[in-house]
Amino acid sequence: SGGEQKRLVLEALLRGPEEVLLLDEPDNYLDVPGKKWLEEQLNQTKKTVLYVSHDRELLANTAKQIVTLELGHAGNSVWIHGGGFVTHAQARKDRFARLEELRRRWDEEHQKIKDLVQMLKVKAKFNDGLASRYQAAQTRLRKFEEIGPPQEIPIEQNVKMRLKGGRTGKRAVVCEELSLTGLVAPFDLEIWFGERIGVLGANGSGKSHFLRLLAAGGTDPELEHLPISDVTIDPVTHEGKAKLGARIRPGWFAQTHHHPELVGRTLIEILHRGDEHRNGMQQEQSARALDRYGLAGASEQKFESLSGGQQARFQILLLELSGATLLLLDEPTDNLDLESAEALERALDAFEGTVLAVTHDRWFSRTMDRFIVFGGDSTVRESDEPVWDEKRAKR
C-alpha cells in the first residue's frame, strides 16, 4: 500500500548515513499507528530533520522549532519560532502585535519629522538663521526614510466558513440490522440531531461506503433526503435499513471522487450560475464568498486547475451554500492547511445540524462527541474515545 511504501522509504532514510533529512509531508498515506511510529523515530533520531507537515498532532509531538513561510506584499519571508507547535499560534499573534506597534511608532515619528521639515521650510523663508536647522531636518528625514519602516506585518490567510444547517427531527440517522455487502456485518445505530460523530477504522473497512449510502439518502430515500448536489453517487449494496430523519438534507464531502459537473468552469461561473440544487449568486456576492474562503485570487481559474487545498475549500463553500443539515465529511482536513483546518473546526462548532466525519486526523478528532469504529473483523461498535489501532480488514 502507499502507507507501507512510505514507511519503507522513511525507514531507509532514518537508518542511512545522511546527517540531515529533508522530508516533504512524511506523514501522508500513513495510518495513525504509522504516524505514531514516525513520531517515535523523529524523537529518537540524532539526525537533523527539516520536514513539511500539516498534521498538527505530529507537529505538537515532534517539532522543536517551527519555521513559518509568511506572505508579504514585497515578497515572502521566513519566521522561526524557537518553541514547539503548542506555543506557536500565541507566539505568532504576539509577534504580529509587536510588528503593528513598531509600525505605528515609525509612522508617528515619520510624520513628526515631516511636520518639522515643513514648519522650518516656511520659517526659513523669513529667517535666514533657520536655514541650517531646515537643512539638518531635511537630512534627518532623508536618513530616516533610507533606513525605512520596520518589517511589514505578513499577510494573514483569513478563511471564514459559515456552515448554517437548520433544525431537523431528533433522530438524524437510524440504522436497523444494516450490513454493507462484503464489508460490514449487521449493526444497529442511532445518531441524534446536533451530534458530531467521528467514523474511524482501517482502510477498506467500509467507512466511506457507509457515508456514501447516507449521502444517497439511505435505504429507499424520500424526496427530502435526496442529495443536494449534482455529484453522481454510486449505489451501495446493503441489507437492512438506513433511514434519515425528518428535514435531513445530506451534504457529502469527499476529496476522492471526480467532479465532472465542475470541470471546465471557473469558480465565479459555478457560483453565478448555480445548479439544480443551489440558486445562482450575483457576481459581487460570489466574489465576497470566494474571498471568505481565501479563493478571491482564483475566481477566474477553472476548478480542475486548483490545488488540492483550494478544491477542498471550494467544495466546503458549496456545502455552505447548499442548505445541508447533515454533513458527511470524508477526510475533510487531508488537503487543508493549518488555518483552513482551524476555520473548518470553528464552522462545524457553529453548525446547526449533525456531522459525521471519517478521519485519521487525531487533532481534528478532538472536536467529535463520540465515535463509530469499523473493525477489522467486519463489526461496527461505538466508543467514547478515538480508536486508532484497528487492523486492516481481511476479505
Please annotate each region the language model reported.
Residues S1-E101, M161, G165-R395:
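ABC ATP-binding cassette signature C-motif
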Residues R95-P186:
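Flexible nucleotide-interacting loop at or near the entrance of a catalytic core
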